[in-house]
């Protein structure tokens, strides 16, 4: 059995001087990042990752619309309630807002549901939040591709 030699690859997250990622100007990744927030997948399209962009667009938009069809509740920031309720409402609001234009258009067109008891409405609320959280992950991916930390 041959002796194993240590790998010559650097550990993930560490770079030698010769393999450090190049300095990328903010303008190179900020536009795709904002586009990725407004329209899910648009940042990937701008960075020429069309397959990934299409998959993200379909995933986030369908998840958001399933949440709407199930009459899920969109969170609004509430203060004055107990700490846990405020934390949940603010967290849900940030997740909903992260869906970008989907959330903005649904709010502009007057979509609002009262919080009702029932499993379907509860699942709808979870779908609306999940759409925003998926878009946050897509935005992180856009930033990593834009700064050339990932292909």
Language model segments and positions:
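Transmembrane helix recognition focused on a "late"/terminal membrane span
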Residues: 2-33, 56-151
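Membrane-interface helix starts
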Residues: 45-55
